[in-house]
C-alpha cells in the first residue's frame, strides 16, 4: 500500500492543512522547522529515549488477558498497557517529546488544553521536570467532572484556567489555548494534546505516539511469531489510536478498528461519533470530519468519558476512513460502562472510560474470530480518574 502522509503542505488527502491567522503562521512554520531538525538529530532522539525509558517507564507490557479470552471464546486478547505509563495514560509519550522541543526552541512557557485532565496532568508533569511555566485551559464542565486532576495540575505548579464559554468542554478549551498562544507566541510553545490542529501538530503527535504501535509490533511478534489479526483503539481526537495504528498501516493483513463514543446513541443528539455521523469542515486550524449542523455550526459532543467528547477527529483518521484502511465503529455510554466493569472483574485492571470503549468493541469482535487469531486492545489509560463519576452514575441508574 502506497501511504506517505502528510504531504509537504501538511495535507492528508483533502484533510489537514494550516488554517491559521497570519499572527500564528510564523510560529507554526518555526515549529515545523525545529521538529524536522530534531527528528534528524541523534542527540535529541537519544535524550527522548532516555526519558521514555527512565521517566515514563517504557516499554509498556503487552499483556495476554487470559480470563477475558476465555470469557469471549474467540481470538486471543492482548492489552497494550499504556495505563502503566507515568501519569497513567498514553498522553505523556507526546508531552515529553514536545517539552524537549520547547526547550530546544528556547521557549520558557507552555500552554495546553485538556478535556479529561490527563493531557493537562501530563503537560504539567513535564513542565515541572524541565522547569517550564505552565498554563492549562480546561472547560468548566470538565473542571467539575475531573476535580482530582485539576488539583494534581495545580500541585505540579500549573495555572489552570477554567473556560465557561460555549459548552465548557474540550473544544472551548482549545479555542482559549489557541487565543493565548497567539498573544504569547514569542516565548510560549503550545503542546497540542491530540492529532489535531494545524500542520505540523497532527504529525508531531502521531510520531511521538507511534512508540505504542512500534512496541506492540515487536512484542507481539516475539510472543506469537507473527502480527496480530486485529488491533482496536478508542478515538476522541485520536492520538492513542494513531500511535497504535500508524506502524501497522502498511501491514494490510492487520485489521484496524477505531472506536468512537456513541454516547446515548448515534440516533440521538448526545454522542461524539464524528466519523460515523460527521461531515467535512474546518476546526482549530485543520480540515477534518466534524459534528456540525447544516449552517456549519459546531455541535456539542457528548460522552460519559471526558476524553472523547471532542466534536472533530484528527485529519489522518479522516483520510484513513475514506480510503478504508481503518474501520470506525461506535460504542454507547452503557456498553463502555459494562466493559469497564467486566475488565475490572475479570483481569483486576481498572481501565479509563475512554479505553473502555475499545474494550467494549473488542468484546464484540473477539468471539467472531478464530482461537488461533490475535486481537490487541490499546489500553490507553487507567480508570482511577473515573471511579468517582462512575460511582455517581451507577447510583443514579
UniProtKB/Swiss-Prot annotation:
Pathway: Amino-acid biosynthesis; L-tryptophan biosynthesis; L-tryptophan from chorismate: step 5/5
Subunit structure: Tetramer of two alpha and two beta chains.
EC number: 4.2.1.20
Reaction(s) catalysed (UniProt annotation): (1S,2R)-1-C-(indol-3-yl)glycerol 3-phosphate + L-serine = D-glyceraldehyde 3-phosphate + L-tryptophan + H2O
Keywords: Amino-acid biosynthesis, Aromatic amino acid biosynthesis, Lyase, Pyridoxal phosphate, Tryptophan biosynthesis
UniProt cross-references to InterPro entries, sorted A to Z: Trp_synth_b_CS (IPR006653), Trp_synth_beta (IPR006654), Trp_synth_beta/beta-like (IPR023026), TrpB-like_PALP (IPR001926), TrpB-like_PALP_sf (IPR036052)
Pfam families: PALP
CDD domains, per database record: Trp-synth_B
Organism: Bacillus mycoides (strain KBAB4)
Keyword GTP-binding applies: no
Names of the cofactor(s): pyridoxal 5'-phosphate
Protein name: Tryptophan synthase beta chain
Gene Ontology molecular function terms on file: tryptophan synthase activity
EC class of the enzyme, as a word: lyase
Family: Belongs to the TrpB family.
HAMAP family, alphabetized: Trp_synth_beta
Function: The beta subunit is responsible for the synthesis of L-tryptophan from indole and L-serine.
Entry-annotated residues carrying N6-(pyridoxal phosphate)lysine: 91
Gene that encodes it: trpB
GO cellular component: cytoplasm
Keyword Endoplasmic reticulum attached: no
Amino acid at each position: 500500500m502506497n501511504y506517505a502522509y502528510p504531504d509537504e503542505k501538511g495535507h492528508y488527502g483533502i484533510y489537514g492543512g494550516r488554517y491559521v491567522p497570519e499572527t500564528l503562521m510564523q510560529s507554526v512554520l518555526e515549529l515545523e522547522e525545529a521538529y524536522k531538525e530534531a527528528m534528524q538529530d541523534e542527540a535529541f532522539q537519544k535524550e527522548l529515549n532516555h526519558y521514555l525509558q527512565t521517566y515514563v517507564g517504557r516499554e509498556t507490557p503487552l499483556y495476554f488477558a487470559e480470563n477475558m479470552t476465555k470469557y469471549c471464546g474467540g481470538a486471543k486478547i492482548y492489552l497494550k498497557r499504556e495505563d502503566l505509563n507515568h501519569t497513567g495514560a498514553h498522553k505523556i509519550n507526546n508531552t515529553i517529546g514536545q517539552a524537549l522541543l520547547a526547550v530546544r526552541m528556547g521557549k520558557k512557557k507552555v500552554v495546553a488544553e485538556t478535556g479529561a485532565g490527563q493531557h493537562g496532568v501530563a503537560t504539567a508533569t513535564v513542565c515541572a521536570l524541565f522547569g517550564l511555566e505552565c498554563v492549562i485551559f480546561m472547560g468548566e464542565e470538565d473542571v467539575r467532572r475531573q476535580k482530582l486532576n485539576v488539583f494534581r495540575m495545580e500541585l505540579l505548579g500549573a495555572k489552570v484556567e477554567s473556560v465557561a464559554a460555549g459548552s465548557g468542554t474540550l473544544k472551548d478549551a482549545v479555542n482559549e489555548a489557541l487565543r493565548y498562544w497567539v498573544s504569547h507566541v514569542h516565548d510560549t510553545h503550545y503542546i497540542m494534546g491530540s492529532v489535531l490542529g494545524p500542520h505540523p501538530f497532527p504529525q508531531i503527535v502521531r510520531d511521538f505516539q507511534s512508540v505504542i504501535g512500534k512496541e506492540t509490533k515487536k512484542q507481539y511478534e516475539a510472543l506469537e511469531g507473527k502480527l496480530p489479526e486485529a488491533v482496536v483503539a478508542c478515538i476522541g481526537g485520536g492520538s492513542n489510536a494513531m500511535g497504535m495504528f500508524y506502524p501497522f498501516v502498511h501491514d494490510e493483513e492487520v485489521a484496524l478498528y477505531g472506536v468512537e463514543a456513541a454516547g446515548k446513541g448515534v440516533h440521538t443528539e448526545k454522542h461524539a461519533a464524528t466519523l460515523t455521523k460527521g461531515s467535512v469542515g474546518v476546526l482549530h486550524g485543520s480540515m477534518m470530519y466534524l459534528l456540525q449542523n447544516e449552517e456549519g455550526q459546531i455541535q456539542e459532543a457528548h460522552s460519559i468519558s471526558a476524553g472523547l467528547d471532542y466534536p472533530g477527529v484528527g485529519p489522518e483518521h479522516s483520510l484513513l476512513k475514506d480510503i478504508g484502511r481503518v474501520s470506525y465503529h461506535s460504542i454507547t455510554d452503557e456498553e463502555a460502562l459494562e466493559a469497564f466493569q467486566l475488565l475490572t472483574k475479570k483481569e483486576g485492571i481498572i481501565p479509563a472510560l475512554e479505553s473502555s470503549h475499545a474494550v467494549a468493541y473488542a468484546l464484540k469482535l473477539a468471539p467472531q474470530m478464530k482461537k488461533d487469531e490475535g486481537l490487541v486492545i490499546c489500553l490507553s489509560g487507567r480508570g482511577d480518574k473515573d471511579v468517582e463519576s462512575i460511582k455517581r452514575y451507577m447510583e443514579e441508574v
